[in-house]
A protein has these predicted regions:
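Glycine-rich beta-strand-centered segment in the early N-terminal region that forms part
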Residues: 21-39, 51-94
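Short glycine-centered segments of the SAM/dcSAM-binding site in methyltransferase folds
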Residues: 86, 158, 182, 247-248, ...
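C-terminal hydrophobic helical "lid"/dimerization subdomain
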Residues: 288-342
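Mid-domain Rossmann-like dinucleotide-binding core that forms the NAD(H)/NADP(H) cofactor-binding site
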Residues: 126-209
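Short amphipathic alpha-helix with an adjacent loop that forms part of the alpha/beta core around
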Residues: 211-221
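Glycine-rich phosphate-binding loop and adjacent beta-alpha segment
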Residues: 234-303, 340-342
Length: 342
């Protein structure tokens, strides 16, 4: 089979197209024929490494945490999927050398494989994983919020999504709307505002406006209940100014820097909760619950992709995976997909 591998960290040129053997799944594993692979920032960050020359944990690595395809074989004890099922994958490559989705067949643990609803496309499935599960987690950690999402779970809540044109922001808007929240989102300009509006946000604001706090307070006079935050260092003062008493701020990225300063007394007085989250260490039970509720949203038609849904798709074939990584690393707006097989 054809696969993309890298044997050293570096820029996209370290990615190579090679032939690898198709392997059989062991106990608790599934072999999936990958149709579409989704590319996320975590993929290029792992490939580039934290520092020049950083050693890999394996001799070589197949990249790609997310994807969608068809189950080809199952190992002993697998009950959640069967041969022939259409599925989506999450965290496929985590702590595994050759389970990534940038290859024609992936063998991976069954608990990273989820049935894809009949009404959902492979493009939708490959666009879930990291973005949708991250968004789900961010929406279910509030002190006064739900632990699971379903229609009505966020009824009466005001959710502020920072960066509504990003992949996580897009999923957060759609999941929050499906769960009944009123959604405010902030973006950098008109083009991204159009995408966030298409995703379903009722209120789309430009975060560079000098009166952004007043604009948010006009929409939510008592403050927002939950914030899905992509840039905590950049937005900490804004978040403090608009969060309500007992509100929660879920941080999933470090856009704008790793260091932030908080006014402790003001956060005391508001009983603010900061929740930092990383999918790799969040726990299998959280991932499983997220997948169940994400599938319910998919079945309801609430998680859609494409420019008309606020998430433009950019496509390359497997041989040009380096181009896909370069697009994501360069900040392409939307979702970058790799067509792996038919």
């Amino acid at each position: 089979m054809k696969a993309i591998v890298y044997s050293q960290t570096g820029d996209p040129s370290v990615l190579e197209l090679v032939d690898r053997p198709v392997t059989e799944p062991g106990a608790g594993e599934v072999r999936v024929r990958i149709v579409v692979s989704g590319v996320n920032p975590t993929d290029w960050k792992s490939r580039r490494g934290a520092a020049p020359g950083e050693a890999l944990p394996f001799e070589d690595v197949v990249p790609g945490q997310d994807g969608a395809g068809i189950v080809e074989a199952v190992g002993a004890g697998v009950q959640n999927v069967a041969v022939g099922d259409r599925v989506w994958l999450a965290l496929a490559a985590y702590q595994r050398a050759h389970s990534g989705t940038a290859q024609e067949f992936s063998v991976l643990p069954a608990d990273r494989v989820f049935a894809l609803p009949a009404n959902a496309s492979f493009d939708q499935g490959a666009s879930l994983g990291v973005p949708a599960v991250t968004a789900y987690r961010a929406l279910t950690v509030a002190e006064d919020g739900p632990r699971r999402l379903h229609p009505g779970a966020l009824a009466g809540k005001v959710v502020l999504v920072a960066g509504g044109a990003g992949a996580v922001g897009h999923a957060a808007i759609q999941l929050a709307r499906w769960a009944g929240a009123s959604v405010i989102t902030t973006v950098s300009g008109p083009a991204k505002a159009a995408l966030a509006t298409a995703a379903g946000a009722q209120h789309v604001l430009t975060y560079t406006d000098s009166d952004i706090v007043d604009q948010i307070r006009q929409i939510a006079p008592e403050g927002v209940d939950q914030i899905v935050e992509v840039a905590p260092a950049q937005n900490s003062q804004l978040d403090l100014a608009v969060i309500r008493n007992r509100g929660s701020i879920a941080v999933y990225a470090n856009n704008g820097g790793d260091q932030m300063t908080l006014d402790v007394r003001k956060h005391f007085s508001l009983n603010v909760r900061y929740q930092f989250l990383l999918l790799y260490t969040v726990g299998a039970d959280v991932i499983r619950a997220a997948a169940e509720d994400i599938n319910a949203a998919l079945t309801d038609g609430a998680l859609t992709v494409g420019e008309e849904a606020g998430l433009p798709l950019h496509r390359v074939d497997l041989a040009h995976t380096a181009d896909a990584h370069a697009l994501v690393e360069g900040g392409a707006v939307g979702k970058v997909l790799i067509d792996v097989s038919l």
